[in-house]
Amino acid sequence: MKPLLILASASPFRRALLSNAGLAFEARAAAIDERALEQPLEASGASPADVALALAEAKAKDVARYFSDALVIGSDQTMSLGTRVYHKPRDMTEAAEHLRSLSGRMHSLNSAIVLVRNDEVVWRHVSTANMTVRPLSDGFIDRHLAKVGEKALTSVGAYQLEGEGIQLFERIEGDYFTILGLPMLPLLSKLRELGAIDA
């Protein structure tokens, strides 16, 4: 008998990725304070990839408490440029600042997945994509943000690659699903290995 799959996320993007792949699953958002977990990790010098893994694990373990024997998928994504770690912008002014700081530079997206069953970690994975933003004028940034509106506040980089955000980039190195925040190919491979989906 295949285990119940639970996605520990409220993200419509992550839900859509699993649905589009034909997976039968339930979704439940984790009730954790991400910033409270991130701050001590970042202060201790944890890498952005390690922070993403820790948050993915915390989300999965929080949700796993409610589903005995289910396989819970926790995920998180961090973004960094040099030593600076970015968070979702609080407002449009901060979104514009984020885009100005990314202009003409390469940043990294670290997407982590942790599978948990009965409070035990079954599997951890992190994938990284390197994203080079083309040089952006202040005028372009302002027009772009006016066009996309509050969607800019829903992602860590203030952009959605699957939409008009693609116009910000000159080069992308890495898996598309890593950029979207859920590395699907390694996840599907592991779920097949665990007998959770049809092989």
Swiss-Prot record:
Q: Where is this site: Important for substrate specificity?
A: 13, 77, 162
Q: Which cofactor does it need?
A: a divalent metal cation
Give EC number(s), comma-separated. 3.6.1.-
**Where are the catalytic residues?**
76
- Chief localisation class: cytoplasm
What keywords does the record list, in alphabetical order? Cytoplasm, Hydrolase, Nucleotide metabolism
Free-text function comment from the UniProt entry: Nucleoside triphosphate pyrophosphatase that hydrolyzes 7-methyl-GTP (m(7)GTP). May have a dual role in cell division arrest and in preventing the incorporation of modified nucleotides into cellular nucleic acids.
Q: Please give the family membership noted in the entry.
A: Belongs to the Maf family. YceF subfamily.
Q: What is this protein called?
A: 7-methyl-GTP pyrophosphatase
